[in-house]
A protein has these predicted regions:
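Flexible mid-to-C-terminal extensions adjoining Fe-S/redox cofactors in radical SAM and related proteins
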Residues: 3, 25, 29, 267-268, ...
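Exposed loop/turn and edge beta-strand positions of beta-sandwich/beta-sheet ligand-binding modules
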Residues: 5, 57-59, 256, 272, ...
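Radical SAM enzyme [4Fe-4S]-AdoMet core and its adjacent flexible, acidic
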Residues: 10, 31-32, 36, 107, ...
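Residues at alpha-helix caps and immediate loop-helix transition turns in enzyme cores, especially N-
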Residues: 40, 73-74, 101, 132, ...
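Conserved alpha-helical substructure of the radical SAM core
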Residues: 1-111
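Hydrophobic pocket-lining residues within nucleotide cofactor-binding pockets
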Residues: 68, 95-97, 156-159, 184, ...
């Protein structure tokens, strides 16, 4: 199988929740909510598949929103993906998941349904809405029982950093299929609840120990944050491969490399977590977008102010979106990177 190319596809903006850290509903992003119609959905899908054929990549779609299950053509899209044998997962809310919905997802080859837990009960319900924590735990079982992997995604900030180790206990106790976390991406400087590099490294130490303790559990732990590479490198658990080409990026952030985000308007972003529009999938060829000058702005790896001086440049680079949210420059130093250069 050819290497995967990931599309994060927002098919609508509408959602049952108004999460406090959501970039769609942030005060800097007050906009009309859009729903992509089904004809446009088919156009975008064909455009993405044409790109993958031309570049010899295997498409992988993360269908999201808003809450994608609220889209009037949600099931039609899933049936289309199923018929074409296209790999996909869902990123959504727990509120509309029933036993019948979970079984239908399984019958249409949904590989994974991602839910969010952003802390323990009080913290999560503060971020999301009252009752969301308990409903999410309930729906983990509903999905897993139907054969759809329930994954848990956590957004980490200074607000909930101390709860993450205990949250991992909860996730494992409820037999989630997968757990991962990413850092909060500030939408404005004054709202940035920034962890210090030392605080974040200490969190990774605690989480790494939890992962070792739960090595035999039913939960798979992903190392989503690219600063894990630095963490393992310093522990002697990651070694830079030998005899590699100097001008090839091998790992780290997929922005500009193997990922695009598509919004309900058709707008294409290099990364959804920062202002990075590069085209429109309803007007432009996705192939031309990805190969074009706008995307090249996100592939200037020598411009990373700190990472370009680091031996892990081609394998890490931290999170450019977090850097952008902090300084409005994706090439500035990752604010949680603790390495001294």
């Amino acid at each position: 199988m050819a290497d995967f190319f990931a599309f994060q596809w927002h098919i609508l903006d509408d959602c049952d929740q108004r999460c406090k850290h959501c970039y769609i509903f942030s005060e800097e992003n007050d906009k009309e909510l859009i729903t992509m119609n089904y004809e446009d959905i088919k156009t975008v899908l064909d455009n993405c598949l044409d790109f993958c054929q031309k570049t010899n990549r295997t498409p992988y779609f993360s269908i999201t929103g808003g809450d994608p299950i609220l889209h009037p053509n949600f099931w039609q899209l899933l049936e289309l993906l199923h018929e074409k044998q296209i790999h996909y997962s869902i990123l959504g809310n727990p509120f509309h998941i029933t036993e019948d919905v979970a079984k239908r997802l399984k019958s249409l080859s949904c590989r994974q349904y991602q839910l969010s837990l952003d802390g323990l009960r009080e913290t999560h319900d503060y971020f999301r809405k009252p009752g969301s924590f308990d409903i999410t735990l309930e729906k983990i079982k509903t999905l897993q029982d139907a054969g759809v992997r329930a994954s848990i995604m956590t957004t980490v900030s200074k607000t909930n950093i101390d709860e993450i180790p205990d949250l991992i206990d909860v996730v494992v106790e409820n037999n989630a299929g997968l757990f991962s976390f990413a850092r909060y991406c500030p939408t404005s400087l004054e709202k940035a609840t920034q962890m210090t590099p030392g605080e974040y490294k200490e969190l990774l130490e605690k989480v790494w120990q939890k992962y070792q303790d739960y090595n035999d559990s039913k939960t798979f732990f992903t190392l989503k944050d690219h600063l894990w590479t630095l963490f393992l490198y310093e522990k002697g658990l990651y070694t830079i491969p030998e005899n590699l080409s100097d001008d090839v990026i091998y790992d780290g952030c997929n922005c500009g490399n193997s990922h695009l985000t598509i919004l309900p308007s058709g707008d294409v972003f290099a990364c959804r977590r920062m202002d990075s529009k590069v085209g429109n999938a309803l007007k432009d060829s996705v192939y031309d977008i990805f190969m074009g000058e706008n995307m090249d702005e996100y592939r200037q790896f020598e411009n990373f102010e700190k990472c370009s001086k680091c031996e892990l440049l081609r394998f890490c680079r931290g999170c450019p979106a977090v850097s952008y949210g902090t300084t409005h420059n994706m090439y500035s130093a990752d604010p949680q990177c603790w390495k001294e250069i």
